[in-house]
């Protein structure tokens, strides 16, 4: 048996590799995104990251009419969110929630890649962000 046949047989037994989900939404987040998209009559919400704040990165959310060539599409609980390519490595595995109480009404991101965030919670840092900062020094 050739090596390629052995590998093919092993792959067939194991099945496809599980891919970590880019983004998951709580019911509250999905409900709020659905409301916002209906209100603006837009098909997508686009999630990105922007360099700002004392810890390096901040999340951005914008309405979108179409999927960009390299955007990652997340369809969950009846809503569609596009993740910008440059944000992908910083947000993979993140859970998006929505908090609405007497003090605030905002989306909250529970990010397993976060290596720290500033005191006010406006910005965060991932391993990729901290590596880039150290390289620039």
Curated annotation (Swiss-Prot):
* Superkingdom of the source species: Eukaryota
Here the transit peptide covers 1-33
Which locations, inside or outside the cell, does it occupy?
Answer: Mitochondrion
Q: Which GO terms describe its cellular component?
A: mitochondrion
Gene3D superfamilies the UniProt entry points to = HesB-like domain
Q: Quick one: a GO biological-process term for this protein?
A: iron-sulfur cluster assembly
Gene Ontology terms for molecular function = iron-sulfur cluster binding; metal ion binding
Q: How is the cofactor bound here?
A: Binds 2 iron ions per dimer. The dimer may bind additional iron ions.
As cofactor, the record names: Fe cation
Write out the residues that bind Fe cation: 54, 118, 120
Q: Which PANTHER family match?
A: IRON-SULFUR CLUSTER ASSEMBLY 1 HOMOLOG, MITOCHONDRIAL, IRON-SULFUR CLUSTER ASSEMBLY PROTEIN
> Whom does it interact with, and what assembly results?
Homodimer; may form tetramers and higher multimers.
**Task of the protein:** Involved in the assembly of mitochondrial iron-sulfur proteins. Probably involved in the binding of an intermediate of Fe/S cluster assembly.
What is the protein's name according to its record?
Answer: Iron-sulfur assembly protein IscA-like 1, mitochondrial
């Amino acid at each position: 048996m050739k090596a390629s046949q052995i590998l093919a047989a092993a792959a067939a037994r194991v099945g496809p590799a599980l891919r970590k989900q880019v983004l998951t939404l709580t019911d509250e987040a999905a409900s709020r995104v659905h409301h916002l998209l209906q209100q603006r009559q837009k098909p997508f919400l686009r999630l990105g990251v922007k360099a700002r704040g004392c810890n390096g990165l901040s999340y951005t959310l914008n309405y979108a009419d179409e999927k960009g060539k390299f955007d990652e599409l997340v369809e969950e609980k009846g809503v569609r969110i596009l993740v910008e390519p440059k944000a992908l490595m910083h947000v993979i595995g993140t859970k998006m929630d929505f908090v609405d109480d007497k003090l605030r009404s905002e989306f909250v991101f529970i990010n397993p890649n976060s290596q720290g965030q500033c005191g006010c919670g406006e910005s965060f840092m991932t391993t990729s962000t901290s590596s880039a900062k150290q390289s620039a020094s």
